[in-house]
Amino acid sequence: MIYLGADHAGFKYKEKIKEFLTASDLKFEDLGNLQLDPQDDFPVFAFRVAERVAKDLAEGDQSARGILICTNGLGMSIAANKIKGIRAVLITSKKTAQQSREHLDSNILCLGANTISFSLAKKIIRTWLSTDFLPKERYIRRLKEITDKENAGDSNN
């Protein structure tokens, strides 16, 4: 399942992404905002999407993904990464989309509605969704280091 979320700045982009995913026969769920609200706050939607992705992953659905959109993708990525098990990435090119999946097993894609064209966004989404994690020893080791720190409970150690 692909979970979508956007604040007011990413709302129109999200609606276009829904059309793109539908045309691509990809299953998704829109977690909001469901209507344009100029007063909404991005963390609400970042947490909502990240919590659903994390829950699905914890229940064994390794295909769970999220796509978050705000003005520049920065706030969404910071907020989503506060949820245990989430590896949210801000992507601006097909190459980094590919590497974020191959090297980092990223599970949430963050996009900036005001920083990349929709044409590029579609290419990024297509690349990100179609790229698998490469289980090379060094990538596994690095992800384990991140997960160990995340599970330690004390970010100052």
Language-model segments: what does each one mean?
Residues F28, I86-S93, F133:
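Short hydrophobic/aromatic-enriched beta-strand-loop microsegments
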Residues Y3-K12, K16, K94-N157:
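C-terminal binding/interaction regions
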Residues F45-V89:
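Helix-adjacent hinge/juxtasegments
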Residues K27-Q39:
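A short beta-strand-loop structural module common to alpha/beta enzyme folds
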Residues K16-L26:
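A short, Lys/Arg-enriched amphipathic alpha-helix followed by its capping loop at the start of a domain
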